[in-house]
């Protein structure tokens, strides 16, 4: 398969951004889905970092209704890390789009035309895909695994911790990869729950409870990533990114690369996943957690819109 050049994909993202008044039109949605598919294909053969950048541009622009910040010609890169784990994750999630399409097709049918066999088949596919993602999480290198923060500056605490949780990562790209994993699993678990709710004659209580617990855990892990990515940042610090304080874990000191990269693109990568928590958690999250997430989303909008009021927020 011939892959599109990166410039073509960036051009497609720019086109989506330029159609702010039509972002929710059928044509824009088709274009968005097409670009996302090409991004996944590009990533399998190239790098996860490029794909996450492009995907976040798409997701965040849709949330805001307009391009959030001008796209830099060159993205600042953090310290080199192995791309193997990221590439393996993309391969593991390659069936997610088809799974979602199958679920949408099944759920759009009238109940009288939906067979138990179809539901069970989709449920099995979702569970198999989820197992592949869990396997990925157990095989990542040790330096990719999040570590609870040992030092959390008061300014970071004041900016927001959920349930006292704060995890540190090698860099913002690794953190974003983990959030992609979590978001993907939440989507899968939602499909599993939906299938279970369509099987009233089966004893699915234990499985449904397990999915609910999993969604809560994954959502809390995303929340625990926020302090590492945003630090104490409450406003744009383009002129002096080093004024932002960050948490540290044992053996993971704050790097210059993180201080340079996180203020520019950190919230950019978080916003789409946090929006998903508010809209796709299947009622599994408490109001307190949803409220915290919305507060942090508003904080991100404050940072990247230079304090301007965002319509509809």
Task: Show the residue positions of the predicted features.
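Carbohydrate-binding/catalytic loop surfaces
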Residues: 152-171, 238-260
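Central/C-terminal regulatory/activation regions of fungal transcription factors
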Residues: 2-200, 204-232
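Intrinsically disordered, low-complexity regulatory regions with latent secondary structure
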Residues: 40, 72, 135, 168, ...
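Short glycine-rich, low-complexity/disordered patches
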Residues: 232-240, 312
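C-terminal region detector
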Residues: 185, 272-275
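Phenylalanine-focused residue identity feature
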Residues: 97, 113, 162, 228, ...
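Glycine-centered flexibility motif
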Residues: 65, 238, 304-307
């Amino acid at each position: 398969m011939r892959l599109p050049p990166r410039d073509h994909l960036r051009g497609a993202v720019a086109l989506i951004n330029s159609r702010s008044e039509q972002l929710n039109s059928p044509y824009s949605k088709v274009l968005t889905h097409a670009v996302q598919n090409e991004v996944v294909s590009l990533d399998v053969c190239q790098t996860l970092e490029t794909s996450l950048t492009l995907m976040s541009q798409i997701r965040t622009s849709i949330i805001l209704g307009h391009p959030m910040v001008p796209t830099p010609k060159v993205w600042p890169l953090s310290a080199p890390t192995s791309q193997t784990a990221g590439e393996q994750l993309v391969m593991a999630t390659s069936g997610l789009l088809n799974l979602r399409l199958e679920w949408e097709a099944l759920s759009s049918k009238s109940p009288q035309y939906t067979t138990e066999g179809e539901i069970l088949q989709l449920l099995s596919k979702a569970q198999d895909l989820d197992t592949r993602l869990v396997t990925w999480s157990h095989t990542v290198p040790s330096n990719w695994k999040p570590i609870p923060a040992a030092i959390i500056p008061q300014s970071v605490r004041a900016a927001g911790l959920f349930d006292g949780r704060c995890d540190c990562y090698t860099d913002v790209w690794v953190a974003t990869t983990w959030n992609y994993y979590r978001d993907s699993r939440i989507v899968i678990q939602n499909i599993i729950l939906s299938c279970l709710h369509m099987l009233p004659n089966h004893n699915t209580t234990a499985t449904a409870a397990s999915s609910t617990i999993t969604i809560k855990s994954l959502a809390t892990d995303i929340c625990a990533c926020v302090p590492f990515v945003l630090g104490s940042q409450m406003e744009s610090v383009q002129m002096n990114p080093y004024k932002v304080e960050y948490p540290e874990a044992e053996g993971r000191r704050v790097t210059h690369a993180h201080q340079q990269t996180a203020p520019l693109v950190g919230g950019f990568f978080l916003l789409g996943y946090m929006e998903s928590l508010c809209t796709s958690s299947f009622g599994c999250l408490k109001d307190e957690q949803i409220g915290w997430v919305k507060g942090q989303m508003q904080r991100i909008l404050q940072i990247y819109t230079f304090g301007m009021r965002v319509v509809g927020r």
